[in-house]
Structure formats: structure tokens, C-alpha cells
């Protein structure tokens, strides 16, 4: 007998050699029916996995993240089975689960139409109704290659596996797929499925490879859950910054300008200007000094920093080292430039910390499949900065940086929407990271200790660090459920030495400083996208590009409307007047669609009494009030940065 420690701490004795599913059956038939996978000794395992020793075990149902992934992973195989039934000539690529669903990539002659997606969905339902058993089996490499000989992408995946790796397959009826799992015991629990869309995707995410057809879908154990999800998806589409931002005239794109290069229109530029002025003033108040550095540098600079070795593929390089005496690259970051400023003068320990800040235009050569609206672009604006400090100052400076980020998030009204991720290196990925295990271990321990001292609730993620050190990532989910990093705070253990940076300590000795890479608001474009989605375009008054719109009832009141505009502008309010010869109801509706915080209607009565008739986004129609009172009210709201 072996002892199984369950999630609630209770211990159950079972025979050795039982599968996770059989252990679930011994606990409860209901639990077994709803089981999707298990977490055995901290690792997600298939329900068929055999347990031979004392272990901790959690049975995962659809209510857990792990259970949902196994559930949707199985649904992706059902989709692949349906494709092979209806389009047997199509070739299989990969079909993982993702947050809120799954996708599968196929090599097909043409992308799937809406009609074909409907047919595939119906075929999936037929397969589920047939309820074939799901079987798992393993094969030696030569037999696996023979089984998959007609599936070139599967053959490539098998050949990519290291020698000695387990090669496993899952079978649903007569459909067999190469897969590591985990999967459900049967397809019957999939009661509701929906194929959402088809897009293009490069094999292995590399645009040098063939473009495949990717089908996205989602699945649930209850139809009511699917209906609720689809309803939420429709709401998300309404908030999608890529759609709403264009409708509101915040940004646009042009194919002749290029992908990943959005054009900020006057409204979008005004929003970013507002945020930038606020951030620069706040950073100055907190002791930062401003720098202004070039948009490009010689390759020599990036070779010193290590970016040339670890990040060259993500850079825009100007020139050819084999032909040109000097090769330049557009900067993907600001750090080496600010290090050059630091090195231009000698520093005593009394001069530290030095806090550099810069509103930096940066360039990154993102692949076409990665780019999306304002969230992932090739040119962006970052509230960048670097703190050079002594080891004794590191914790306080890190704490102050986190404090600034929290202040910014609270002021923007999104403090409750963010999560913290401690991103660490992967010691097996020496191409991506500086290979100094001792320094990595030491720096990661320092950061973990600081985060614990600050009582920050964080998760840990391997292989997500910067190449020169660990980082704290502030994460935000977009309307589609995808998690994006909006701000990072990094501890750098390597670049001070590479750039020969030092300070003179109290004994007159040269010492290496610590460096904190940080941002206060992140990439302005990404933050703008996040705010559009958070507020469904109805940005807080202090951020809104147009804070008030004045609507005269007719041309007779144009002069008074202009007088109202002038007074508001004099007090720093962003205001416009709508003098078009349209009916007032039409102009009010249009101003509402533009998410204007305040609509001010002026006619004969308002002109005579020096009033404005106020319609606010928050309270609706408020009636007439003295112009002076309204001006004071909106100025105070803007000054307080109310959300």
C-alpha cells in the first residue's frame, strides 16, 4: 500500500500501481466523472499515469486552470479528428490548449471559410456523440516515424525530440495524434464546443516557414457556460482597443507605412502627451534626472552590452559588418546610452543613487504574427529609466520603484487589475542568457527576498528573465484574456562590469554599483491600449483627449460658445466647439459616441445668464449652472486626476 496526500491534507492509502483516474474513483465516482487531469507531486500528469509510491495528489476538474487546459487540449484533438474526416488531405501541425480555449494548426490548400468551420463544428459534435474511448500509447522512435510518415510536421517534431525522450500518442476512435498530453479519459464530458475563427500562423512561429491555417475554438462541460463565455467575448470585442481606438479616432494604420507602426491621430497624441507630462513631472519630483539620447548607435555599443549576442535578431541593423566599416542599429533599449552618460564623470558613494529617466523611442523587430494594434509594435515610446546604486541602497531603491509603479497604477484606476510575476532565467538556455549561474542564483535570491519584504503577492516563471538579470513583471490581461507585460523592474548584475562602471567608496576604493532597470508606466502605446479596453473608450476626464464639447443651439449663439471655449482653454481644459449646422440632438448623440466627459449646450438663456447646460457622462443631464462654477468643477476634477 502507498500513502496519497490529498489537497485538503488528508491521507488515503491505496494499492501501488493504480492510475490517477483509479485513485479518483476510489475517492468518489462523481470526482472521477469530472476529473480532467492530476497534479502529482507538483507536476501536471495525465489521468492514466500510474502511481507507485507515496505522493501528493490533486485531482483537477474543469474548475481549475490545469483541468481547463486538459479539457480544451482534448477538444483540440477532436477538432483535428474532424478535419481528417472531412479534409483527409490536410496535414496536422500542433494543437495546444490556451487560456479560454484551444487552437490547431493545419497545412491546407486554403484557409477555412465560415461555412467550413460550421461543418467542422458539426463533425466534432458527431464524434463527441459517438463517445470513443481515448487511448494513450508509446512507441520507439523508428515505429513512431513510420506511424507518422504521412504527416511531415509530426515527423519533424519527432526528430526534434532528444534521444531517450518518451514518444507518446493519443487515439480517439481511428484518429491518432502525436502528443504528450494530458487528456480526458473520453470525449463525452465535452458538452459544448464552438469554433471561433481561422487565421494564418507560421509553422513554429517563424515567418521563414510556411504559413498554416490556425483554427481557434473553445469547449465547456455545460452549454450555459459556453453561452456565458460567448456573451463575454462579444463584450470584449466592443472593448477591443484595436477596433475601438480606430472608431474613436485615436490611432490608425497604413499599409504603406508598415505593419507594427501605428499612426497616432491628434486625439491619441494628446492622450500620450498628457500621460507623458504627468510621468515626467512625477519622476522629477522623486529625484530622477532627465536624459535625451540618440535613436541609434554603432554595433560596438551593443557588443559591449551583450545585446548584439543575445538580441540581434530583434534589432533593426543598418549596414553589413562584412562590407561596412561602421554598422549601426536602431536602439531596442536605452540602458547602454545612460551608462555612457554615467561613465562621462566620476562618482563617489555620496553621489549615489543616480536615477536616470528618459521618454525613449525604441525599435524592436517583432515578427508579423506577434504584432497587434498598440500592444505589440515595432516602434514604441517607453518611460525608461535606470538607477545606479550601492548594494546597501538596492532594497530601498527597488522599494521606491515599486512604490512609483503602484502610485501610477492607482492613479490610472487599474491597481486591482494587475498581477506580479517574478521572472527567472533558464540555466539550460545559455543562448538567451549570460552564462553565470552563481550570479543568477545570488541575484534571484536578492530579488525574492526584497519581494517578500515588500509583501508582494507574486508568481514565479522560468525562462522569462532579461538576459542580464531577473525581473519583476507587472502583468495585465487584455480583453481577449491574453496576459501582457506592461511594466518591468529588473536587477542587473552584469552590465556595470561590462561597461566598466564604478563608484568610489568611503575608503577610496573602486566598487561596482548595482543597476535597476525600470519603467514607471511602461510603453505608452501599450498603456493607452490597456486604458481604452479598461474604460471601453470612456477615459477619465483628466486623460480624455477632449474633456468638454460646447454645442451652440444655432449660429446665433456661436459667439457665446466661443467665449465658453476660450474660458475653459484659459484654465487648461481641452475643449472643442461643434459649430456644424446639424440638429442639436444629432450633435449630442455624436459627442456621446465619442465618449466626451462633458457636453455643454448653450442657447439664449445660457448666453444671457453666463451659464452652460451640462450633460455629463457620469450623471447624465444635470441642467444649467454658472459657467464659472462649471469651470472650477472640471478644473478640480482634472487636477485631482479623478477616475
Swiss-Prot record:
UniProt region (Catalytic), positions on chain: 240-540
Subunit-structure text: Homodimer.
The keyword Transport is annotated on this UniProt entry: no
Official protein name in the record: Threonine--tRNA ligase
Organism: Clostridium perfringens (strain SM101 / Type A)
A cellular component annotation (GO) from this entry: cytoplasm
Protein transport as UniProt keyword: no
Gene: thrS
Domain TGS: 1-61
Cofactor note: Binds 1 zinc ion per subunit.
Family the entry assigns: Belongs to the class-II aminoacyl-tRNA synthetase family.
InterPro entries membership: aa-tRNA-synt_IIb (IPR002314), aa-tRNA-synth_II (IPR006195), aa-tRNA-synth_II/BPL/LPL (IPR045864), Anticodon-bd (IPR004154), Anticodon-bd_dom_sf (IPR036621), Beta-grasp_dom_sf (IPR012675), TGS (IPR004095), TGS-like (IPR012676)
EC number: 6.1.1.3
Entry binding sites for Zn(2+): 335, 386, 517
Reaction equations catalysed: tRNA(Thr) + L-threonine + ATP = L-threonyl-tRNA(Thr) + AMP + diphosphate + H(+)
Keywords for this protein: Aminoacyl-tRNA synthetase, ATP-binding, Cytoplasm, Ligase, Metal-binding, Nucleotide-binding, Protein biosynthesis, RNA-binding, tRNA-binding, Zinc
Amino acid at each position: 500500500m502507498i500513502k496519497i496526500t490529498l489537497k485538503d491534507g488528508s491521507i488515503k492509502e491505496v494499492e501501488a500501481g493504480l492510475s490517477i483516474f483509479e485513485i479518483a474513483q476510489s475517492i468518489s465516482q462523481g470526482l472521477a466523472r469530472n476529473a480532467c487531469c492530476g497534479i502529482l507531486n507538483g507536476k501536471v500528469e495525465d489521468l492514466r499515469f500510474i502511481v507507485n509510491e507515496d505522493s501528493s495528489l490533486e485531482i483537477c476538474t474543469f474548475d481549475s486552470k490545469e483541468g481547463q487546459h486538459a479539457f480544451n487540449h482534448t477538444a483540440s484533438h477532436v477538432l483535428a479528428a474532424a478535419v481528417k474526416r472531412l479534409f483527409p488531405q490536410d496535414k496536422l501541425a500542433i494543437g495546444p490548449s490556451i487560456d479560454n480555449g484551444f487552437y490547431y494548426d493545419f497545412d491546407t490548400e486554403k484557409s477555412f471559410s465560415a461555412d467550413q468551420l460550421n461543418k467542422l463544428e458539426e463533425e466534432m459534435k458527431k464524434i463527441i456523440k459517438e463517445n470513443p474511448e481515448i487511448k494513450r500509447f508509446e512507441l520507439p522512435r523508428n515505429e513512431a516515424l513510420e506511424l507518422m510518415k504521412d504527416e511531415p510536421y509530426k515527423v519533424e517534431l519527432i526528430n526534434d525530440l532528444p534521444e531517450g525522450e518518451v514518444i507518446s500518442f493519443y487515439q480517439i476512435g481511428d484518429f491518432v495524434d502525436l502528443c504528450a498530453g494530458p487528456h480526458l479519459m473520453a470525449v463525452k464530458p465535452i458538452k459544448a464546443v464552438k469554433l471561433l475563427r481561422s487565421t494564418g500562423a507560421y509553422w513554429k512561429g517563424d515567418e521563414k516557414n510556411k504559413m498554416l491555417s490556425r483554427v481557434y475554438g473553445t469547449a465547456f462541460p455545460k452549454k450555459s457556460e459556453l453561452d456565458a463565455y460567448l456573451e463575454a467575448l462579444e463584450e470584449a470585442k466592443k472593448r477591443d482597443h484595436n477596433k475601438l481606438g480606430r472608431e474613436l479616432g485615436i490611432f490608425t494604420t497604413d499599409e504603406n507605412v508598415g505593419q507594427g507602426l501605428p499612426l497616432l491621430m491628434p486625439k491619441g497624441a494628446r492622450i500620450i502627451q498628457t500621460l507623458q507630462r504627468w510621468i515626467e513631472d512625477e519622476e522629477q519630483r522623486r529625484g530622477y534626472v532627465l536624459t535625451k539620447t540618440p535613436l541609434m548607435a554603432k554595433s560596438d555599443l551593443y557588443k559591449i552590452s551583450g545585446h548584439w549576442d543575445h538580441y540581434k535578431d530583434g534589432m533593426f541593423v543598418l549596414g553589413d559588418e562584412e562590407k561596412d566599416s561602421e554598422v549601426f542599429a536602431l536602439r531596442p533599449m536605452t540602458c547602454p546610452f545612460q551608462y555612457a552618460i554615467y561613465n562621462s564623470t566620476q562618482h563617489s558613494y555620496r553621489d549615489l543613487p543616480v536615477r536616470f529617466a528618459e521618454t525613449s523611442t525604441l525599435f524592436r523587430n517583432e515578427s508579423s504574427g506577434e504584432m497587434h494594434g498598440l500592444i505589440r509594435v515595432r516602434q514604441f515610446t517607453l518611460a525608461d529609466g535606470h538607477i545606479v546604486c550601492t548594494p546597501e541602497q538596492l532594497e530601498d531603491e527597488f522599494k521606491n520603484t515599486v512604490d512609483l509603479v503602484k502610485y501610477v497604477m492607482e492613479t490610472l484606476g487599474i491597481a486591482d487589475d494587475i498581477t506580479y510575476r517574478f521572472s527567472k532565467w533558464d540555466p539550460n538556455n545559455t543562448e538567451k542568457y549570460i552564462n553565470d549561474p552563481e550570479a543568477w542564483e545570488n541575484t534571484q535570491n536578492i530579488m525574492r527576498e526584497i519581494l517578500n519584504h515588500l509583501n508582494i503577492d507574486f508568481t514565479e516563471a522560468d525562462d522569462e528573465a532579461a538576459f542580464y538579470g531577473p525581473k519583476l513583471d507587472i502583468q495585465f490581461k487584455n480583453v481577449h484574456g491574453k496576459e501582457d507585460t506592461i511594466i518591468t523592474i529588473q536587477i542587473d548584475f552584469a552590465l556595470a562590469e561590462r561597461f566598466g562602471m564604478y563608484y568610489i567608496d568611503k575608503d577610496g576604493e573602486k566598487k561596482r554599483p548595482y543597476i535597476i532597470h525600470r519603467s514607471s508606466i511602461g510603453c505608452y502605446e501599450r498603456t493607452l491600449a490597456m486604458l481604452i479596453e479598461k474604460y471601453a473608450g470612456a477615459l477619465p476626464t483628466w486623460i480624455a483627449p477632449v474633456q468638454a464639447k460646447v454645442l451652440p443651439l444655432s449660429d446665433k449663439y456661436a459667439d457665446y460658445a466661443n467665449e465658453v471655449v476660450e474660458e475653459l482653454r484659459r484654465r487648461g481644459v481641452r475643449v472643442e466647439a461643434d459649430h456644424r449646422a446639424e440638429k442639436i440632438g444629432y450633435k449630442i448623440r455624436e459627442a456621446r459616441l465619442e465618449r466626451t466627459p462633458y457636453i455643454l449646450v448653450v442657447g439664449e438663456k445660457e448666453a444671457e445668464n453666463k451659464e452652460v447646460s451640462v450633460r455629463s457622462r457620469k450623471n447624465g443631464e444635470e441642467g444649467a449652472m454658472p459657467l464659472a462654477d462649471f469651470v472650477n468643477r472640471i478644473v478640480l476634477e482634472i487636477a485631482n486626476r479623478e477616475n
